[in-house]
């Protein structure tokens, strides 16, 4: 797209910016006519990005009383497990139907957010990564036995969380989930066909769509 076309697009559509959230709404669209919206989440999972995601959904629900569906396009390599779980619990209780779409890569703690919806799509070349959680070693020194055990206990807490959520949104056997979350060498990488076989993707390939309201979330630093 040429610079001239980009300038014309900017003039035609109002672009609003809040922190690392950009949203576009057509000039001719009335708030009461909006029944479908999209959020493109292209970021790691952390306290700030999850807050942006949840606040964007709240803003859509608050501004557009006739909203029926929100399509959430995820591209995330994962990040903080606690933030991912908080988002999972908030999203799965959403009064508005949320459709999760793997837009390219959904990995690690981002898979928790993906599993928050019963409507799970993917783009044709998208992939998933399921693997063990990692616990931080805040003591950058030699570890005593009890300190090492605490790190292992923290990791197992998050791996148990992975298994519990995966057992609710996939058909992966319990023994296989145990293996996946026990060793990085047993990590599972799924393309869309294999993700469908295990139930992680339970809808068809997502077709291109246009939306009257679109939000973009990124953790890119300006």
Protein language model features and the residues they cover:
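Thiamine diphosphate
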Residues: 110
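N-terminal organellar transit peptides
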Residues: 1-107, 116-222
């Amino acid at each position: 797209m040429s610079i001239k076309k980009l300038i014309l697009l900017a003039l035609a559509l109002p672009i609003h910016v809040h922190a690392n959230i950009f949203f576009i709404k057509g000039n001719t669209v009335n708030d009461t006519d909006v029944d479908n919206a999209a959020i493109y989440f292209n970021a790691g999972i952390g306290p700030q990005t999850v807050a942006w995601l949840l606040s964007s959904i709240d803003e859509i629900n608050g501004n557009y009383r006739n909203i029926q569906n929100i399509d959430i396009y995820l591209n995330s390599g994962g990040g903080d497990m606690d933030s991912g779980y908080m988002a999972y619990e908030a999203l799965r209780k959403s009064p508005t139907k949320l459709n999760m779409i793997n837009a390219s890569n959904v990995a690690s703690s981002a898979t928790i957010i993906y599993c928050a919806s019963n409507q799970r799509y993917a783009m044709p070349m998208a992939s998933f990564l399921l693997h063990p959680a990692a616990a931080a070693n805040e003591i950058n020194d030699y570890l005593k036995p009890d300190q090492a055990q605490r790190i292992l206990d923290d990791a197992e807490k998050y791996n148990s969380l992975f298994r519990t959520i995966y057992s609710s949104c996939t058909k992966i056997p319990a023994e296989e989930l145990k293996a996946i979350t026990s060793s990085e060498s047993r990590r599972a990488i799924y393309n869309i066909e294999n993700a469908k076989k295990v139930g992680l993707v339970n809808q068809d390939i997502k077709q291109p769509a246009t939306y009257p309201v679109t939000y973009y979330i990124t953790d890119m630093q300006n």
